[in-house]
Amino acid sequence: MNNHTTSITTNKKHHYRELLAIGIPIIIGQLGTIILGFADTLMIGHHSTPELAAAGLVNNIFGLVFVSYMGFTYGLTPIIGRLYGEERTDCIGQKVRNAFCANMLTGCIFTLALVVLYLNLGRIGQPEELLSLIRPYFLVNLASVLFMGIFFTMKQFLDGLGQTKVAMWAMIGGNVINILGNWVLIYGVAGFPELGLLGAGISTLVSRILMALAMVGMLMTGKNFGEYRRDILRSSLTKADFKEMNRLGWPVALQLGMESAAFTLSCVMVGWLGTIPLAAHQVMITLSQLFYLVLSGMAAALAIRVSHFMGQKDYVAVRRNAYDGFRLNLLFSLCMGLPVFLLRHQIGGWFNDNMEVQAYVATLIILLMVYQFGDGLQYTFANALRGIACVKPMVLYAFIAYFVISLPLGYTLGFPCGLGILGIWIAFPFGLTIAGEMYRRRFEKELKKIEK
């Protein structure tokens, strides 16, 4: 029996401690990314306003790409987790090798799409004075896509084994290097040239390369990974494994991409209302990221645990982990949400001096609290489905929840009904809760089918 699963039995009533042990390192790693986003925005914004605007456009584009790319690589986790639970660790190396090739090919597809977009940047209605800033920053970010693919592959492999601390330390180290690099290259410190936005891009590229190398280095030198290292190097590519990775990866990529695109389109709709609502919306998106990193981190831990128990054919524990993960997410949302709710009249002032913005933020925080139930539900059971390798239905469910229900409802309430930004935000709880309930019902249906 693997050390990670020795103490796990169907008699165990709850799995909170084990979920936290795997989930907290994921959350800490993601917290570093959020802090990096704050630092990037702060440093670029203090250098110049046009650079901040240019960075916002490019970062939104690459954010959508990286969310989708990461979603594709998620296909590896249930494969590794199932084999680990079955104690068939001798098969893991071949799966990782095939996943690496599939992930690199997918990275090339994303890169090609971004090259096409780069060649058409002048046609998407951006101010001419920003294009000279956007283009070099875009190219430097483009150079990092495949390195992120390497990092994602190694992360999902190690996460599948329950080794989530490795990626946590790599991400923390990469973020520290990025912040220091920003300081040196944006402002021209210690004899380096003052590169502004381009310096921020170069710093990001270097940190992503080092993160990828750190993960590969851990695999190649770590004492605990000798068996996997040998199997990865000696194994061969197979059509069946390559197809399996694509079968599991693309639905998750599409599901996460649609979720991200729906929020981006909501931001566009808020922009139609003017500067004040858009500023309030940006404050709320920043706040919601803090909830996101906790909910998604715990949900990722749940997917790992569920895949392990699927390998052991312990379906009682599969169900218990899913619902324990949901309860933990609700508890975290409550613990984080209570101080945010109590400080709702002060929080807007931390970000902006405008009283209208602060009033909008105070009201929108109430809606943010309401949609935490639906957000926790959909993160939990989307990852539970990922853990049991049932991912195709999520594409349809995400399309229905976000593009058939949430976006049209937000538009209808916001504009024809005259509720403005409040109407757009009222739609979020509906879309997220409906998505979560569809995922939950599908999880129960698939699990009952497997149990028979």
Regions found by a protein language model. Name each.
Residues M1-G23, I80-L146, F192-W250, V306-Y371, ...:
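Short alpha-helical transmembrane segments in multi-pass integral membrane proteins
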Residues A21-D40, V140, G174, S207-M211, ...:
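Transmembrane helical elements of multi-pass membrane transporters/channels
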Residues I24, I28, V58-I61, C101, ...:
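Hydrophobic residues within alpha-helical transmembrane segments
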Residues L31, I35-A53, L121-E128, V184-L195, ...:
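Helix-terminus/linker motif at the lipid-water interface of multi-pass membrane proteins
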Residues T33, G37-D40, I44, F66-T73, ...:
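Alpha-helical transmembrane segments and their lipid-water interface positions
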Residues L52-V115, M148-A167, C267, A280-R344, ...:
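Small-residue-rich hydrophobic transmembrane alpha-helices
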Residues T73, T77, N141-D159, A167-N175, ...:
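Short runs within selected transmembrane alpha-helices of multi-pass transporters and secretion channels
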